[in-house]
A protein has these predicted regions:
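Short acidic/glycine-rich loops and adjacent helix/strand connectors
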Residues: 1-178
Length: 178
């Protein structure tokens, strides 16, 4: 939590006010402060998956980089209700782990992940044990924790650090050109 505060203050704290001010430019007379509603990131993902589905009841798993604080969530959908039952919070994120690997292999974060996914079937799982043994602690209940000594994404400066480089045998590849 302490590591994430600088990024949260910069990126998230004033986001709602910023959006309301921008919308006010379009229609200054509309009551944006009271009419504009916000839902949590993972709740929105879960709702968009469950409500249009043909299922009356379902367990909905959402995993990505990070929403407000949640990175992984489990929701139970029943009829017209959706209840979040479990969450894993930042900085522990499979999405950010994937982005760190994307960064390390020389692709741009938030745009190169699909390339890594597309190349994955052509590779060998030679780093799977290394990742499981060092980067992630998978708990018996399926939850997980990332060992933060290998990552720098909490500072917003880089995805990985020298410990990550040492673990994988060298520095990250230079980012791809535009």
């Amino acid at each position: 939590f302490k590591m994430a505060i600088p990024i949260w203050l910069k990126e998230k704290l004033f986001q709602k006010d910023l959006l309301r001010k921008q919308f006010k430019k379009f229609d200054p007379d509309f009551d944006w402060m009271n009419k504009l509603l916000f839902s949590e990131h993972h709740f929105s993902h879960a709702a968009s998956a469950f409500f249009p589905s043909p299922f009356e009841e379902a367990c909905v798993l959402t995993m990505d980089g990070v929403g407000e604080w949640a990175t992984t969530s489990v929701a139970l959908g029943q009829g017209s209700k959706l209840e979040m039952t479990k969450e894993i919070h930042f900085p522990h994120s499979l999405g950010l782990l994937y982005s760190a690997l994307t960064y390390y292999t020389g692709f741009r974060v938030n745009s190169g992940e699909y390339k890594v996914m597309g190349l994955a079937p052509y590779g060998e799982p030679k780093y799977a044990d290394l990742i499981r043994d060092n980067l992630i602690d998978i708990k018996e209940d399926g939850s997980f924790r990332l060992d933060q000594k290998y990552f720098d994404y909490c500072t917003g400066l880089a995805m990985t650090n020298r410990h990550f480089d040492d673990l994988f045998g060298g520095p990250a590849r230079t980012a791809e050109e535009l």
